[in-house]
């Protein structure tokens, strides 16, 4: 079941992000990797800046999260993570479809250039690499 996150979900969102972000260890630039990958303060700051999370719950346990943030002309997909033990079950797809369905603007997604699995995931869902003047570490996607 997909639902909007509530304040009570904060710790679970924090834990899912940091569990799933382990996949980036050794992949992203070393100066960008740290543990936890995202601190509570960073997560709180993103939420205060307008990231609205949706959660996928399985038997009342949140196993996947994905955020969307309104940025004038576009909506940004932010922090798309599924618990490591729950990957490859279609949860990310369901969350992405839900956010796309609710978007009224073009969607932009940024990910690490070296995260080829993430790039393939978004390409499978109709996104394409956008022409970019953004640093080579990350590549944006555009619907």
Residue ranges and their predicted role:
Residues 41-54:
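A short helix-loop-beta-strand connector motif used in the catalytic cores of GNAT acetyltransferases and
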Residues 102-114:
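Conserved GNAT acetyl-CoA-binding A-motif
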């Amino acid at each position: 079941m997909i639902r909007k996150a509530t304040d009570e979900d904060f710790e679970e969102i924090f834990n899912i992000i940091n569990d799933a972000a382990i996949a980036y260890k050794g992949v992203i630039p070393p100066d960008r990797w740290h543990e936890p990958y995202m601190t509570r303060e960073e997560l709180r700051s993103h939420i205060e800046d307008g990231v609205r999370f949706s959660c996928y719950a399985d038997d009342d346990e949140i196993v996947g999260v994905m955020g969307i943030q309104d940025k004038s002309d576009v909506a940004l997909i932010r922090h798309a993570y599924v618990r490591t033990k729950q990957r490859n079950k279609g949860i990310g797809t369901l969350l992405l479809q839900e956010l796309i369905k609710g978007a009224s603007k073009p969607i932009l997604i940024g990910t690490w250039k070296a995260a080829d699995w993430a790039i393939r995931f978004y390409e499978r869902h109709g996104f394409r690499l956008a022409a970019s003047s953004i640093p080579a570490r990350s590549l944006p996607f555009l619907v």
